[in-house]
Structures are given as C-alpha cells and as structure tokens.
Amino acid sequence: MDYLKVSSNGELHIVGMNTNSIRKITKDGKIVKVAGRGYQGYSGDGGPATKAMLKSPLAIAFDSKNNMYITDMGNNRIRKVDAKGIISTFAGSGNFGWAQDGETVEIYLHKFP
C-alpha cells in the first residue's frame, strides 16, 4: 500500500511501505527518491536521507518550513528530513510500547504511530 501527500511546493510524495522509501513526482514529471535505500533497516541519522534505511514507512507530513516527517513504523520512530535532505530521528527510541504520563516521547513510540 502506498500513501500520497502533496508538499507545500506542489510536489506529490509517495510513501512506499513495501519499498521502504519515499519518492516524489516533481512538477516537471520526474520521479525522484527522497528517502530510503529501498530495503528495510535503520540507519542514516545525520546524513543524506537517500542513503538512510527505513522499515515500513507508513505516512508523511510537512511543517511550515517544508521539513518532512516520516512515520517509520517498523522502526518505531518518527524520522525528520530537513529542507536540505538530511535525516534524523525526531521521536522514538526504537522500543515498542506505550509511554506513561510524564515520560518523554523518545522513550516509546507505539507500533502503529
């Protein structure tokens, strides 16, 4: 199953849960990889998102600065790709579970965020 989202600059982004990647269709019709290497895993924080590994990404969202947030479901994390294409972990430690009141979001991220 794929998830589609349009960014603020009008580009259509495609979340490939089975391809472990995020691609976009540019305004001139080209398909460009944005994040993920195409096979599952966890790596890449601090480097180019196109060289990072994702595991079953589910959905994406954009903030006002056009940073992209990826629900990296298989890794129990939310990953952030900044406007320069650098990926980082925004939330989650990779542990499955529920956070209790007062705990930080980095401790747990539910399996299906």
Predicted stretch roles:
Residues 20-24, 30, 76-80, 86:
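A short loop-to-beta-strand structural motif that recurs across blades of beta-propeller domains
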Residues 17, 73:
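Short loop/turn segments immediately following the C-termini of beta-strands
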Residues 1-3, 30-56, 86-113:
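Gly/Pro-rich loop segments of beta-rich domains
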Residues 6-9, 62-65:
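Residue-level detector of Asp-centered blade-edge/turn motifs that repeat once per structural unit
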Residues 11-13, 67-70:
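Conserved beta-propeller blade signature
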